[in-house]
């Protein structure tokens, strides 16, 4: 499994796009020489720090079958500052937050997550953009596309076809009655011999 965890909200769509790219390019039944291999790492798009709190336990102590890649940017568009007010001054457990930007808080969360994975000897890496802008995003997309293209031969599959997706399209065309597509391989729809809950 490959987890791409975006620590900048503007980069989450890129993590989501990577999930689609990696899944359709590397999830294959057959190798390039025709052998049945049923291979491909499961891609997971995650949003740090939200998914850090919902998924990190699994990544730190669960099966050792994941590589976690952090996606962040050195320069953020806007910085929301936590005011140094009554709450941060009146309670010791909040005092350290006063006058700190949310970027500082997210960076600390990122460092903590990387540290917890590293301390448990879990594979983790970081991709840091200078900023979230067109040149940086373009470079990131090319990097992820190249990584996918190079991973195909490592798994012994062609990363440039998607026969599983094509089959689903053909079956959908058949279900819609499109000329030239037969419905003989269609499964029954819900209610036709299947349990409905």
Which residues does each predicted region cover?
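A SIS-like phosphosugar-recognition module
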Residues: 1-197
């Amino acid at each position: 499994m490959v987890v791409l965890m975006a620590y900048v909200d503007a980069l989450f769509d890129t993590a989501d796009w990577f999930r689609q790219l990696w899944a359709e390019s590397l999830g294959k039944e057959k190798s390039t020489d025709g052998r049945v291999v049923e291979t491909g790492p499961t891609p997971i798009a995650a949003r740090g720090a939200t998914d850090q709190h919902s998924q990190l336990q699994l990544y730190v102590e669960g099966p050792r079958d994941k590589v976690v890649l952090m996606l962040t940017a050195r320069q953020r568009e806007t910085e929301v500052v936590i005011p140094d007010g009554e709450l941060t001054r009146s309670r010791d457990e909040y005092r350290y937050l006063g006058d700190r930007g949310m970027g500082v808080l997210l960076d600390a969360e990122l460092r903590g997550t990387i540290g917890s994975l590293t301390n448990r000897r879990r594979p983790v890496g970081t991709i840091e953009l200078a900023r979230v802008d067109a040149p940086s995003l373009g470079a990131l997309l090319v990097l992820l596309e190249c990584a996918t293209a190079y991973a195909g031969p490592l798994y012994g599959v062609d990363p440039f076809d998607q026969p599983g997706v094509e089959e689903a399209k053909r079956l959908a065309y058949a279900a819609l009655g499109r000329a030239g597509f037969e419905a003989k391989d269609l499964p029954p729809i819900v209610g036709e011999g299947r349990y409905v809950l």
